[in-house]
């Protein structure tokens, strides 16, 4: 994707923005949890729970691109939370999630048509 964007002189930043999907917080309640080799005990009371962030591959003022060959287990939920964040913040950038070289070429063609009047 990087080489296609560069070859077509499409302005972007690689991992240029980090989005906070869920803020970190302190969990005050008791939370009895088991780990692989340890018994079930209160593991969370008073401890910080890490936030959830998302950093797309390529960003610009017009679009966001996440190149995904195979999504890991957490990606579908993270992607939904990301879309919700964009919606709630009235972010109107176009989202692209190509999964193959052919998809990447289609994305570049669409970006050129939408934002560069078909050329650079």
List where the protein language model places each region.
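Electrostatic, structured charged patches in enzyme active sites and in nucleic-acid/phosphate-binding
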Residues: 1-120
């Amino acid at each position: 994707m990087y080489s296609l964007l560069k070859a077509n002189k499409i302005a972007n930043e690689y991992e240029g923005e980090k989005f906070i999907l869920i803020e970190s917080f302190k969990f005050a309640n008791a939370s009895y949890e088991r780990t692989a080799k340890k018994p079930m005990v209160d593991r969370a009371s008073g401890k910080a729970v890490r936030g959830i962030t998302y950093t797309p591959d390529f960003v610009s003022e017009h679009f966001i691109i996440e190149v995904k060959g195979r999504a890991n287990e957490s990606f579908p939920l993270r992607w939904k939370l990301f879309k919700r964040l964009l919606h709630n913040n009235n972010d109107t950038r176009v989202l692209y999630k190509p999964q193959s070289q052919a998809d990447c070429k289609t994305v570049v063609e669409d970006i050129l048509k939408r934002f560069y009047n078909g050329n650079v």
